[in-house]
Amino acid sequence: RFDGKAFLEIEPIKNLSIKTSFAYQYNQWNSIGAEPAYIPQDSYGNPVGGSGKNYLTDAYYSETQWINENIITYHFDVNGHAFNFLLGQSNQYNNFRSTTATGEDLPSDNITVLNGALSTSAKGDAAEAALRSFFGRVNYNYKDRYLAEFNLRRDESSRIPKKNRTGYFPSVSVGWNIAQEAFMEKYSFISQLKLRGSWGELGNQEIGYYPFAQYIGLGNNYVWGDNKVSGVAISSLANPDIKWETTATTDIGIDAAFLNNKITLTADYFYKKTSDILLQLPIPGIVGISTEPYVNAASVKNEGWEFALGY
């Protein structure tokens, strides 16, 4: 296993910062498993089943992940108005590869190499994914009294078909720190009083490596003349029209504290809706394929109130 990170940050002019970072992670493991020969017997010592064969399994797995981020920030104040700007770009990549080999009927249970097996078989798998993002943020603060923030992300994922690969996800939040207003000075028992609201969208790309692709299965042999011929066949249907799953969240809340923060109160109303959820919907058996294609076919809503009172 290797896990490392490096970064470089410079400030070419006052209040302007430029930072680049790179993180890399590599994981690898190997395992060998053995199953000794065993023939179950009844109470009279007669064999009652079992192959009488021993088995050996040799497995290998490796995974690589890396991320590169490049971020520029700038901030300045003018007569109590504070502005913060952020502009960034990131690249992410990950892949994995696995191989499993199995041997059976070895001359001894003590042999742990596949060359000693009478017959062997192997299977493997590999996949990769990449995500490229651009993002920006503007933050405004006036004397900790009026607060506002706007964010925008542009994500491009290899897990989504090319025609819908790019998604835009904005968010905005505002706050009013009422306790900082001059007219609140006569209410000395109120230590804190803040109203806030936010709305934003996020995209979900954790939907498998190739949910839009058509899969081909091996082992579909057929007869041509007097000969058995190896063949392939479609094992799952493709849907090149799938798109990002998107979650939109709205939150409106109030934070309050009384008697020098001895009593605290937080209240929130939230509304969350996830749209275009990917599902595998049933298809008619006459199609002849058992694995259904992914479809953006569902949505889920959550709505409610949250209260917290502390002393």
In which residue ranges do the predicted regions lie?
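N-terminal, polar/charged subdomain of small-to-medium soluble alpha/beta proteins
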Residues: 35, 40-41
